[in-house]
Amino acid sequence: MLDLSLPSGLRDLLPDHSAHLAELSSKLHDVFSRFGYRRVFLPTLERLDVVERGLSPAALADVMKFVEPGSGEVVAIRPDITPQIARLYAARPDALPSPARLCYDGPVLRAREARAGRPREVYQAGVELLGAGGASADAEALVLLARSLERVGLKAPRVEVGHARFAEAVMEAARLPERLRSAAWEALSRKDRAALAAAAAKGRGSAEAREAVPQLAGLFGDGALDRARAIARAVPEAAASLAETEAALRIARRRGVREVAVDLGEARGLGYYTGITFAGYAPGAGAAVARGGRYDGLLARFGRPGPAIGFAVDLEFATQALERVNGRGRGVRPRRASARGGRARARPR
């Protein structure tokens, strides 16, 4: 008998659900356009070396690759669209002068599920601001994210802001032994003060830096910026990243973004993001519907160095958030992977 089931982690989207995704994408592109972002369409397949050049080490396991029958070339199904944008920007300076504001939507496919029950194929819409650095560009991305979430119908969405270099600067100043660094970052991702303190006690840095390491787990919620300022006074290496964060927040707030939270102990995206990071949340939701940040190191990998910042909205997460808010239940669940499938760590967006 013919097996009509789909591979694990994939699913069909029926007409009603497809219409919701299309409507969300249309609303997002309306906002993107008003901010001056121009839409591009990109292929689903890329050469493997292009894809790998644009991913963090943790995301390489998410690449689905195969040998193209005709050419014998190794190609990959995109697990993320940002590297494609970087490749396009580097390849076409004639058509894309700096700064370039580009937007996109489309599916990405990852080799493994990010979490049990989550699909491997994710529909995204996003923006990239290429060739613009500084607080003004950071704030533009924050404001655009907030306006985008409002436009799709999420009332009082919350934007959470961090900085990739703040915790990293503190960890480096504490001079943790090489064998403990990975464990310390894992502890920070769990907000585990005790484990951070144990790792810091073995550090060879200043007493102030070692004392600051467990405090990273508390740099969220009310008073987070005050606590971060105290750390930056004790650990001057962290001061620049805090100043960048506060500058972007001041501009974003002047432009009307009010629901902003801070988490400067965020460990997501280590090795990929180089500056401010942010996530967008629906009211009452624990999972982010959008993620992004500054990734100034990426464009140089493709031969056109420069600053860059962007974010992507998970269209299905956004749809599900709207369904919760409106009391409807049209969510679509993917076919679950077997226990052998394990967990995936996708690129941090």
Curated annotation (Swiss-Prot):
Give an example GO molecular function: histidine-tRNA ligase activity
Region listing for Disordered, in residue ranges: 327-349
One matching Pfam family: tRNA-synt_His
This entry carries the following GO cellular component terms, namely: cytoplasm
Q: In which pathway does it act?
A: Amino-acid biosynthesis; L-histidine biosynthesis; L-histidine from 5-phospho-alpha-D-ribose 1-diphosphate: step 1/9
Which PROSITE patterns does UniProt cross-reference here?
Answer: AA_TRNA_LIGASE_II
Recite the UniProt keywords alphabetically: Amino-acid biosynthesis, Cytoplasm, Histidine biosynthesis
Amino-acid biosynthesis as UniProt keyword? yes
Q: Does the keyword Amino-acid biosynthesis apply?
A: yes
SUPFAM superfamilies annotated for this entry?
Class II aaRS and biotin synthetases
Residues passing through the membrane, by range: none
Annotated CDD domains: HisRS-like_core (cd00773)
Q: Where in the cell is it found?
A: Cytoplasm
Q: Which GO terms describe its biological process?
A: histidyl-tRNA aminoacylation; L-histidine biosynthetic process
Locations of Basic residues compositional bias?
330-349
Assembly and partners are described as: Heteromultimer composed of HisG and HisZ subunits.
> What role is this protein assigned?
Required for the first step of histidine biosynthesis. May allow the feedback regulation of ATP phosphoribosyltransferase activity by histidine.
Which family does the record claim for this protein? Belongs to the class-II aminoacyl-tRNA synthetase family. HisZ subfamily.
Q: What else is known?
A: This function is generally fulfilled by the C-terminal part of HisG, which is missing in some bacteria such as this one.
The protein's name = ATP phosphoribosyltransferase regulatory subunit
Report the source organism.
Anaeromyxobacter dehalogenans (strain 2CP-1 / ATCC BAA-258)
